[in-house]
Amino acid sequence: MSRRNPARNQERILKAATAEFARYGLGGARVDRIAARAGANKRMLYYYYGNKEDLFLAVLEASYARIRRAELGLHLEDLDPAQGVRRLVEFTWDYYLKHPEFLTLLNSENLHRARHLKRSRDIAAMHSPLIALLRDLLLRGERAGRFRKGVDPVQLYISIAALGYF
């Protein structure tokens, strides 16, 4: 691992940590295995991330960032409201199937009652653009008489995510 390319080093560490945490959970994950898989030493992991819990948070944030980027790439704002909601449901289902590590990371974090995500400065900001798009779809659908009035976009997204998750 090159010391002269911090971004690349962090990317390798996050990739290795994602695999480790997805397989073993936070409690079973070992920094030694993450370092070996990343081609780094433990000191480098601690230098970039401080401790295992902060590395886990970084993995969660990176995982959420990936799904949010993919969701925003759907361009739901360009679709008919019903098509947009349907597209988001289909995408969410497909994403979970293609990225089972995302669900196992969520399982691990759920066991800790979202302790790590609550400390994140970035997670809420990641959700906002998607919720705004979903709110717009719902309002457009409501005005067109296709959706009932008063659907909460946050609750709808939680329902969509839960359908794919469970």
What would you call each of these model-derived segments?
Residues L117, H127-Y157, L163:
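Hydrophobic alpha-helical bundle segments that form small-molecule/ligand-binding pockets
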Residues A62, R66, Y95-H99, R113, ...:
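Phosphate/oxyanion-binding loops and surfaces in catalytic or ligand/nucleic-acid-binding neighborhoods
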Residues Y49, S108-A114:
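Short helix-capping/turn signature of helix-turn-helix
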Residues K52, V59, S63, I67, ...:
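Hydrophobic/aromatic residues within well-ordered alpha-helical segments
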Residues R23-G27, D78, H99, A144:
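Short coil/turn segments at alpha/beta junctions that flank glycine-rich nucleotide-binding fingerprints
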Residues N9-A17, I34, V59-S63, I67, ...:
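Generic hydrophobic, amphipathic alpha-helix propensity
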Residues L72-T104, A125-H127, L133, P153-I160:
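Hydrophobic alpha-helical connector segments
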Residues R12, E20-D54, A58:
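Helix-turn-helix
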